[in-house]
Amino acid sequence: MIFDTKAAKFTLKNVFFLSLLIAAGAILIFSLVPGDCWFGSKTDWYSQHVTIADYMRKNFYATGQLFPDFTGLGGGTDFYSLSYYGFMRPDVLLSYCFPNLPVAFFIQGYAIFEILFGGGLLYYWLHKKGFSDFTSFVCGFFYLTANCFFQAHRQIIFVNYLPFLILAFLCLDKILNPEKASLYSIRPHIGLIFSLFFCILHSFYFFPSCFVACILYICHLLPQFKNGMVKSCQAGKIWW
């Protein structure tokens, strides 16, 4: 059964399915990584993402600057020409606090965390949308095993924004639900801003597509809630 007619409450049963989904994804990832190896390729992942992040960390220790104007990489270049790599991400900034640990440790761990986090978010979102536990679980598993996630250990900027796009969809569901407008007057808006900001922070090249996806999702939701919004809310209250 694809849809469930029951109220979409998150119960202990759902916690079990969510835990099972994340555990299955973690087992698949760690079983595919050879022993004594990083979850990353020697080409794009190590030569670009790890090397540049490590240089930035060393430069920060030497100068105290988070945004250097100039880097010595590639014979010397403007730092902002490398900004599309998303080096203000939480994993890179967190590595600054642990100088004795390799940068690769943080980038690898964060990439794995984001894959599992995205799969869990998709399960939760579909469950809240009224899909059955089976459908939500299967879709979450398909997400975890999607072919595009080979980029998680290569060009990570191609996929590391996806969990925050799903989080943006979750926030839009709450914003455009007039029945919960009184309960969620500000929080979903903050969540949407947070989600889109992190999409930019991780991969601003892909933010335009994320923004278009959110606009299309809003267009999908508006007819569904049009009657309720007219009766229950003023037009301005949808947003503020």
Question: What kind of region is each of these model predictions?
Answer:
Residues 1-9, 181-185, 225-238:
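Membrane-interfacial, low-structure loops and terminal tails that flank and connect transmembrane helices
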Residues 1-33, 237-239:
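Start-transfer (signal-anchor) and selected internal transmembrane alpha helices
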Residues 21, 115-125, 129, 133-224, ...:
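Membrane-embedded helix bundles of polyisoprenyl
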Residues 24-119, 143-163:
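Membrane-interface coil-to-helix junctions
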Residues 38-39, 100, 178-179, 222-230:
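Transmembrane helix-loop junctions in multipass membrane proteins, especially transporters and channels
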Residues 45, 52-63, 205-214, 218-219, ...:
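Transmembrane catalytic cores of multi-pass membrane glycosyltransferases
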Residues 88, 172-173, 228-230:
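Juxtamembrane/interface motifs at transmembrane-helix termini
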